[in-house]
Amino acid sequence: MDRVFIEELTVFAQIGVYDWEQQIKQKLVFDLEMAWDCKQAAETDDVVYCLNYAEVSQAIIDYVESKPFLLIERVAYEVADLLESRYQLQGLKIKLSKPKAVAQARNVGVLIVRGCLK
């Protein structure tokens, strides 16, 4: 299966379990792989047959910025549900990072894998 990817999509979200975290916007970084059959787009050179990564990116940004979250796990699962339902993906991999969440670590996060990308 072909894959469409988006790397380092940055979103600023109201996220965290501490009271002070809910008062600020924090950086979240998405890396995505989406199973998508690119054959028809390649054969026709017609954008109507491709997975529009600009549209996918905006859908993620709009959703994550629309409400507060406590956990990145919830963000990752809800974004996965959104993308699967909106774009009928065969598989999906989301790496969601919350940089600087742990002072001694460069990065922390979750990796969600669904469908044929397992």
UniProtKB/Swiss-Prot annotation:
Protein keywords: Folate biosynthesis, Isomerase, Lyase
Pathway assignment: Cofactor biosynthesis; tetrahydrofolate biosynthesis; 2-amino-4-hydroxy-6-hydroxymethyl-7,8-dihydropteridine diphosphate from 7,8-dihydroneopterin triphosphate: step 3/4
This protein's record includes keyword Hydrolase: no
Similarity comment: Belongs to the DHNA family.
GO BP, sorted A to Z: folic acid biosynthetic process; tetrahydrofolate biosynthetic process
Keyword Amino-acid biosynthesis appears in the UniProt entry: no
Active site: K98 (proton donor/acceptor)
Binding sites annotated in the UniProt record for substrate: E21, Y53, I72, E73
Reactions it catalyzes: 7,8-dihydroneopterin = 6-hydroxymethyl-7,8-dihydropterin + glycolaldehyde; 7,8-dihydroneopterin = 7,8-dihydromonapterin
GO cellular component: cytoplasm
Domain of life from the UniProt record: Bacteria
Stated role: Catalyzes the conversion of 7,8-dihydroneopterin to 6-hydroxymethyl-7,8-dihydropterin. Can use L-threo-dihydroneopterin and D-erythro-dihydroneopterin as substrates for the formation of 6-hydroxymethyldihydropterin, but it can also catalyze the epimerization of carbon 2' of dihydroneopterin to dihydromonapterin.
Molecular function via GO: dihydroneopterin aldolase activity; isomerase activity
Catalytic activity, EC: 4.1.2.25, 5.1.99.8
InterPro entries (alphabetical): Dihydroneopterin_aldolase, FolB_dom, GTP-CH-I_C/QueF
Protein name: Dihydroneopterin aldolase
